[in-house]
Amino acid sequence: MTKCYQTTLEFSSVKRRRVEADFSGGEITSDAGALLLSQADKRLGLCRDVARALGDQRLRARCEYSVEELIKQRVYGLALGYEDLNDHLQLRHDLAIQTAVSRDKPLSSAATLSRFESRADREAALAIHQVLFDQFIAAHEQAPRRLLLDFDATDTPLHGEQEGRFFHGYYDRYCYLPLYVFCGRHLLVSYLRQSN
């Protein structure tokens, strides 16, 4: 029979909040994977670098959440399978996701995230891609002798009257057809396209 000697697993604390995983009850979440995402993101610095690249033109005195916190909340939510902004009506109160974003209070609302995403433009997309390029370069001690770029398109089904939707005969549905460019395991470009 297997014997377990470790009853808890400790994570980095957030302000006054001690964070540990155990199985004795208390505050329960099905999204504890956000804590692991947060640890990986700390090592990579991806959300931090994207926030710096985007900058913040808002009046800081009127803002409760930093750009980095908004990005982390949205990215971690997407990684956990919560694509819709309305999911954040509940997620903002989840202790694991709050902890992953390094807050000990409720996170931003769906409306705040929506306003944040609505400000995104071509310049923001280029700035984010520059961060991806920089991460790719930083992952190599020296320049690779050869680069093999993998261009992939995949369908993203649409279920409403979204702007720019077209019917794609091959996929037999309305969809977008985003383009992804990888070099090995590194994503270099993610470009949302219409499927026409």
Residues covered by each model-derived region:
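Dynamic "connector" segments at or just before major functional cores
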Residues: M1-N196
